[in-house]
Amino acid sequence: MTEQLEFFPVQSPCRGICQSDERGFCRGCFRSRDERFNWNKMSDGEKQEVLRLCRQRLMRKLRVNKPAPSDEPEQPSLF
């Protein structure tokens, strides 16, 4: 399989929130401490891998925080 050529440098996913959650991942971009500190030293391939991991972490968080479906029908109360 051929590798896709990258014409532009991989941009940092930083959103300027820069706070760690209970697992040590940034609440804004979902990178670990090492991933944040070493971003500028990484190759584009390594950065792409970090971005893939960040997407996985985001999806995992969204699944965990998704409310369970209720058994009651969704009908507004009249009172």
Swiss-Prot record:
Organism per entry: Escherichia coli O6:H1 (strain CFT073 / ATCC 700928 / UPEC)
PANTHER family: DUF1289 DOMAIN-CONTAINING PROTEIN, OXIDOREDUCTASE
Gene symbol of the encoding locus: ydhL
Name of the protein: Uncharacterized protein YdhL
